Amino acid sequence: MARIPESDWKFLTNHALVLSWITQHPQTTARETAIAIGITERTALKIIGELDASGYITRRRRGRRNVYRVNPNLPMREETQKNVMVGDLLGVIAPKRAKRNVA
């Protein structure tokens, strides 16, 4: 099999990676998310805020932590992917927990 050369591009955006991580780790912190994905904590907080503001996740306080729930019934944001629901993507990239941590 031919080796794929190293480069900086990825198939999934940081937003998709954060959403996938939250699906699998609903009590995660922004710091834990950032470390797992390889982004800064500030970037993780920004992405979590954007996902929350757009309705893709909801946050609920439990003690000193947030617990996240994912809304799988919203469409992808890309114009060419509006017929694909976020839950469909999560079923592929986070299959083990996708069904348990959804609204």
Which functions belong to the PLM regions below?
Residues 1, 75-103:
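Amphipathic alpha-helical dimerization/coiled-coil segments
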Residues 4-15, 29, 61-84:
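Short, cationic-aromatic polyanion-contact patches
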Residues 16-21:
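Pre-recognition alpha-helix immediately N-terminal to the DNA-recognition helix
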Residues 42:
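Key DNA-contact positions within bacterial/archaeal DNA-binding proteins
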Residues 46, 50:
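Alpha-helical DNA-recognition elements
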Residues 32-35, 52-53:
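Alpha-helical residues within the helix-turn-helix
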Residues 52-62:
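A short, conserved structural fragment
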Residues 9, 22-25:
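Short helix-capping/hinge SLiMs at alpha-helix to coil transitions
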